[in-house]
Amino acid sequence: MRYGFFDISQDFITIFCPKKTLKNCMFGLIGSRTQATLRQEKNQNFSFFVNEANEIAGFNFFDIKKSFRRGLISHHFTAGLNYPSLKLVKKISELLNYDLTPLAKKVPFVVCEVISAIPIPNTHLKRCKVNTGSNKSLDVVCGADNVRVGLKTVLVHVGGVLPDGTIIKKAKIAGYDSMGMLCSEKELNLKPKNQGIIEIKSHIKIGKSFLDVYLNNSEKFSAWVSTKKRVTGN
C-alpha cells in the first residue's frame, strides 16, 4: 500500500512529551517521512512540517493543555513506549486538518519470537529470523548474548523511533540485512534496566502490541518478563 511517496508499512507516529525540559509541549514524528525536505507552517499553538509529497512529517504542540483534554495524553509516553492511541491520533488529525488515522493502527513495538539465530563468523553477532505473527518472517541482526531460538522478545520495526529519538532504519550489518531491532529494557527506557534483550514469557501472544502488554502488566512486571539473569546487551 502506498501513501504518497512512502511505504505506509514504515510510517509510525511517535510522540515525545519531555516534561523535564519542556513542560506542556508535545512533539510528533512520523518515522520514514523524515528523509524528505521539510518546510514549516505555524499556528498559534502548534507547528507542523510538510514534505515534498505534501505529507505531514512531524508536528509540535506548544501548550497541550489548550489543545487536549485531561487524560488523553497518557503518562506512558514518559516510559519510552511513545506511540499514540487512536483517540489521540483522531484529535491530532482534527487540529492539524490532516488525516493521520490510517497510521494509528501501525504498531512499531511488537512481541516477536526468534525462530533462528545463526552466529556470524568473526563477530559477536547473530543473524536472526523472527516471527511477528504475520505471514513473513523478518531478518534481524542482533548482538545480545541472550538471543536464542524460541525466545520471545520485543521487535521495533523499521520506521519506529526509540525513546532517545533514534529512528530504526533498514540496515546492512556485517553483510546481512537487518529489518528492525530487538530491544533491551534500557533501549526502551524501562525499569528494571537488565542487560540483554527483553525476555518475554511464553504465554504472551506473538504479534501483540508491546505497549498493550506493558500497560496491562506494568505493575506486575514479572507477569510478562522473564526474571532470569541476563548477560551483556546488544
From Swiss-Prot:
Keyword Transcription appears in the UniProt entry: no
| Gene3D superfamilies linked | Nucleic acid-binding proteins, YtpR-like
Ordered alphabetically, the record's keywords are: RNA-binding, tRNA-binding
Ranges for the tRNA-binding domain? 103-211
For this protein, the record's InterPro entries field holds: NA-bd_OB-fold, tRNA-bd_dom, tRNA_bind_bactPheRS, YtpR-like_sf
Q: Name one GO molecular function term.
A: tRNA binding
- The name under which this protein is listed is Uncharacterized protein MG449 homolog
Q: Which organism is it from?
A: Mycoplasma pneumoniae (strain ATCC 29342 / M129 / Subtype 1) (Mycoplasmoides pneumoniae)
